[in-house]
A protein has these predicted regions:
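Nucleotide-activated donor-binding/catalytic signature segment of Leloir-type glycosyltransferases, i.e.
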Residues: 189-205
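A charged, aromatic-enriched C-terminal amphipathic alpha-helix characteristic of glycosyltransferases
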Residues: 278-308
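A conserved mid-protein helix/loop that constitutes part of the nucleotide-sugar donor-binding site
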Residues: 143, 147-169, 183-190
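Acidic anion/phosphate-binding donor-loop and adjacent secondary structure
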Residues: 13-16, 98-105, 109-110, 115-136, ...
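Short hydrophobic beta-strand element within catalytic cores of glycosyltransferases
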Residues: 242-246
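Aromatic "clamp/platform" in nucleotide-sugar-dependent glycosyltransferases that forms part
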Residues: 206, 225
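Short His-centered aromatic/hydrophobic patch
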Residues: 35-41, 60
């Protein structure tokens, strides 16, 4: 299809943001505006409506949690308007679709679920790529628990570190590999230091090649408090790595025999991680929906159907 990137002001500067959007919408004869910014899609789709763009797609990728009362409250306010300006509703999962667009719309088939697509080939890195990383971080003969994602309230790093602290008493060779950055990074770093876990926890930071880090792990942990889908869960299984998830992760994310869901109970997580046996991961048939080669064709077909 081809694409070009246009820099616009951040939405926090709303008037300037809308002014620039209006300029580009007016200057180009767009048939479709597809917004992926969840409840904030209200703003670009409002301007698309003002500019008489015929097809306006709101795409939701998340559900709210209790991370910040002000932020969560804003999401609930914007949700009221999220069904006003779109002509079409899309979500990454049933859970995300029902939350933003309502049970009635979902049950009547007005919400299209489009999976977050993944390039499967990227998640099978070669030994030449993995061995230097493994050596640099001294991971040979270690039991590596990975957590790949932003350091936010939703991802629940504090819970995982408390679980890991107890896991070390049962598996002395355990290492916690944390990949990512975010607003709580410094707080989590201090939490690790306070628990004297510096020698057992590796903070990798933000990376551009997360696919290489999945295969360094024996298991990936996703103890999320809330999730719209959990791309980390999907990617872990595609990489052939077992993953333990919380009950906040939707069913759609389970695409193999190597995904285990456990309630957010520390003892249960410690027991599972301490007794985990490595197994060969076999993807299920529904994993194909996440393959970018298939999903991209479906998205093109979706657009073409809309502009008929």
């Amino acid at each position: 299809m081809g694409a070009r990137f246009i820099r616009i002001p951040p939405y926090q500067h709303l008037l300037e943001y809308l002014k620039v959007l209006k300029k580009y919408f007016k200057a180009n004869n767009y048939a479709i505006v597809h917004s992926h910014i969840n409840t904030l899609s209200v703003f670009p789709l409002y301007m698309a409506w003002k500019c008489n763009i015929p097809i306006r797609i709101a795409h939701n990728h998340s559900v709210p949690g209790g991370e910040n009362i002000k932020r969560t409250g804003l999401k609930y306010i914007l949700r009221v308007f999220s069904r006003v300006f779109p002509t079409d509703y899309v979500a990454c999962s049933e859970k995300a679709g029902r939350w933003l667009f309502g049970n009635k719309n979902f049950d009547k088939g007005r919400v299209t679920v489009i999976k977050n697509a993944v390039d499967f080939k990227r998640f099978r890195p070669s030994a030449e790529v993995l061995e230097p990383l493994c050596k640099a971080m001294n991971l040979n003969n270690k039991f590596v628990v990975g957590c790949i994602g932003r350091f936010t309230f939703a991802k629940n790093h504090k819970f995982l570190i408390e679980v890991f602290e107890n896991l070390k008493k049962r598996r002395e060779n355990a290492i916690l590999l944390l990949v990512g950055d975010g607003e709580l990074h410094d707080n989590i770093h201090k939490w690790i230091q306070d628990k004297n876990l510096n020698d057992s926890v590796i903070l990798v930071g933000q990376v551009t090649n997360p696919e290489n880090y999945y295969k360094l792990c024996d298991v990936v942990a996703v103890p999320s408090i809330f999730e719209g889908l959990s791309l980390t869960t999907i990617e872990s299984q595609i990489a052939g790595v077992q993953v333990i998830i919380s009950d906040a992760v939707p069913d759609e994310a389970i695409i193999s025999n190597g995904c285990v869901r456990i309630d957010l109970n520390k003892d249960l997580w410690v027991n599972k991680l301490s007794t985990l046996k490595l197994t060969e991961i076999k993807l299920t048939e529904n994993s194909k929906a996440y393959n970018i080669d298939i999903a991209s064709k479906k998205l093109c077909e979706y657009y073409l159907e809309k502009i008929k």
